[in-house]
Amino acid sequence: NLKDAVQIQQMRQLTDQGVDGLIVCCSNPVALNPTIEYAYGKGVPTASMTGYLTSEYAISTSVNYKLTGYYIAQWLAETIGGEGNVVIMEGIPGTSASDSQHQGMLDGFAEYPDITVVAEIAHMWTPQIAQAELQKWLSANTIEVDGFAVQSSGESGALNALESSGRPMVPMALGGEIGAFCYWRNNPDFIDRAIYAWPPGDDAEFAMNVLLRTMYGQGLKIQSILVPPYEEDVETIQSFVPEDCDRNSSEFRTVGIENWASDEYLNNFFDNGEALL
């Protein structure tokens, strides 16, 4: 729900009701810590998906967000020839996933002295906000923009804003929204790849598998398990997005748990790792 106070209330209620484990999403890295310790004291482990937590009692599972942001920046910089103006669109400032990816983008662009970050806009991981905020910025600024580094869950709205502005359709990072893939599927020269930070279904299954393995006593070796970003090209996108696709689709790509956080990969992080099924 992206509201720490509500998550804290829900976590305490669920713990008191006798649940065996908790999964939280997209949180501030410190706000939930006392509640996580409370649950741990009751014998209830907590796993975080889509970002990390700093509690010593939590398990964190996600993509390496800083590395993903860095990859996106490097890809965009190379795509536009190593020079020009770029706009960064981050998610929810203050959440670990957004802040880590945002810093990775800044670090990646910093390696290109001829690239200038002309704006940093928060889209709150919401396509409608992404569209409104980017439209506002594009209307107020006449500066030429050569590329957009957009955190996934905002790219469909950002694409709509760019297209309606009448400006050139310059490269933009895409990361799994089917509505945005619809545009790319029918404009295959737009970009050469998508870089995934969080296919939501796969990310949830990743966290659930780690939590269940821990509860079954497989012996978790470390507190945080990260996966690398995943990439797909337009030919792959065209294989599952039809030509008559919906530009306003709110669905996300599922790449498959075997491609995101496979059993073979997870076994490395447990003393007695084995597939659950």
Model features per residue range: what roles?
Residues 7, 60-86, 100, 129-131, ...:
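Hydrophobic alpha-helical segments within soluble ligand-binding/sensing domains
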Residues 55-63, 92-95, 118-123, 144-146, ...:
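Second-shell loop/turn segments in exported
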Residues 11-40, 105, 119, 123-184:
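Hydrophobic alpha-helical
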Residues 29-67, 78, 85, 177-191:
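Flexible loop/hinge segments that line or gate small-molecule binding clefts
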Residues 68-72, 96-116, 129, 133, ...:
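Short, solvent-exposed amphipathic alpha-helices that sit
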